[in-house]
C-alpha cells in the first residue's frame, strides 16, 4: 500500500502483532519497508522488507515508521547510518582496530593519508565528504573538503548567488530543518552566518539530520565522541533550530 522507512534506531519485525518471543528480524534506522494493509486499532501494520537479500514479512508499530524523503536524501542518510552501524552503533572508537581503518577510508577519499590513529586530526568533515561522495551522483557538486568551513562557505555563496548546488546555506530562522540537511556548529571561536559568508577558514562541525521529531531533530556525525554518533538539536516553537550549543547555520539539502 505504501513505502515507509524505519524511524527508530532499530526496529523488531515480528511474526504477529504482539510483543512476545516472535522476532523475525531486526532492521536498522532508515530501512525500507512496504506496508501491506492498513494500520490496526493497536497501531500495528503488516509489512514486508528485504533483509540480506531475503524478503521477510511481519508486523511493526506504525509510529516507528516515517514517510520517504527524496531518493538522494535517503542515500545520504543511509550512508550515515551505515557508518554508524559499521562503528558498532557508536561504540567503536576511532583509534582501535578495525575502526581506525574506516576513518582512513574517509581520509583517503579526499586524498589525505591519515587514519583514526592520527588523533590530533579531526575527521568529521572527512566523514561528511565520504557519505556525500557515496550518495553520488546528486552530490557531485558538493565541496568535498577536510574542513567543514569550506563547504559551509560554498553553500552560503551558492545560495546567495542562486546557483545550483546540492546544499544551500541559511540562517537558523530562514529554513525549518529537515531530513538530509546539515546542522552547523562553530568550534573554539564564535561564528555567524554572515561571517561564514566571507570566510572559509574557521573551526566548525556539521552533522546530517536523520530524524525529525516534535521539538527536536537527531543527526549523525563523524568524530562525535571519537566515533560515528548521534546528536540531538532542539527546535523552537516555530520549528526552527535553536541558536544554542554553538549552532549558527543550517545547510538545506536541495536534492
Where are the language model's segments positioned?
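Short, flexible surface segments
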Residues: 29, 79, 178-180
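...with weaker cross-activation on analogous glycine-rich loops/strands in unrelated enzymes
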Residues: 140-226
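Solvent-exposed, acidic/flexible segments
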Residues: 20, 26, 40, 70-73, ...
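Aromatic- and glycine-rich peptidoglycan recognition patches
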Residues: 5, 9-15, 21, 38, ...
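Short beta-strand/loop turn elements enriched in aromatics
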Residues: 1-8, 125-161
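SH3/SH3-like beta-barrel superfamily modules
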Residues: 25-62
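Conserved positions within tandem-repeat grammars
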Residues: 11, 58, 168-170
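N-terminal capping segments
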Residues: 66-142
Amino acid at each position: 500500500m505504501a513505502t515507509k522507512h524505519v524511524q527508530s534506531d532499530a526496529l523488531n519485525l515480528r511474526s504477529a502483532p504482539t510483543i512476545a518471543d516472535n522476532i523475525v528480524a531486526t532492521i536498522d534506522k532508515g530501512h525500507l519497508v512496504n506496508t501491506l494493509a492498513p494500520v490496526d486499532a493497536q497501531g500495528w501494520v503488516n509489512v514486508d522488507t528485504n533483509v540480506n537479500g531475503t524478503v521477510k514479512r511481519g508486523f511493526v508499530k506504525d509510529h516507528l515508521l516515517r514517510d520517504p524523503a527524496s531518493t538522494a536524501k535517503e542515500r545520504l542518510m543511509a550512508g550515515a547510518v551505515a557508518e554508524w552501524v559499521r562503528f558498532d552503533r557508536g561504540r567503536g572508537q576511532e583509534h582501535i582496530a578495525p575502526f581506525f581503518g574506516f576513518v582512513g577510508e574517509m581520509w583517503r577519499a579526499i586524498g589525505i593519508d591519515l587514519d583514526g590513529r592520527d588523533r590530533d586530526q579531526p575527521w568529521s568533515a572527512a566523514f561528511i565528504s565520504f557519505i556525500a561522495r557515496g550518495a553520488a551522483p546528486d552530490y557531485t557538486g558538493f565541496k568535498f573538503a577536510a574542513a567543514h568551513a569550506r563547504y559551509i562557505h560554498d553553500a552560503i555563496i551558492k545560495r546567495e548567488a542562486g546557483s545550483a548546488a546540492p546544499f544551500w546555506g541559511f540562517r537558523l530562522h530562514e529554513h525549518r530543518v529537515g531530513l538530509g540537511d546539515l546542522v552547523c556548529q562553530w568550534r573554539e571561536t564564535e561564528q555567524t552566518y554572515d561571517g561564514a559568508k566571507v570566510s572559509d577558514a574557521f573551526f566548525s562541525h556539521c552533522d546530517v539530520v536523520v530524524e525529525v521529531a516534535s521539538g527536536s531533530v537527531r543527526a549523525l556525525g563523524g568524530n562525535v565522541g571519537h566515533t560515528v554518533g548521534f546528536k540531538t538539536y532542539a527546535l523552537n516553537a516555530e520549528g526552527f533550530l535553536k541558536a544554542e550549543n554553538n549552532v549558527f547555520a543550517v545547510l538545506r539539502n536541495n536534492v
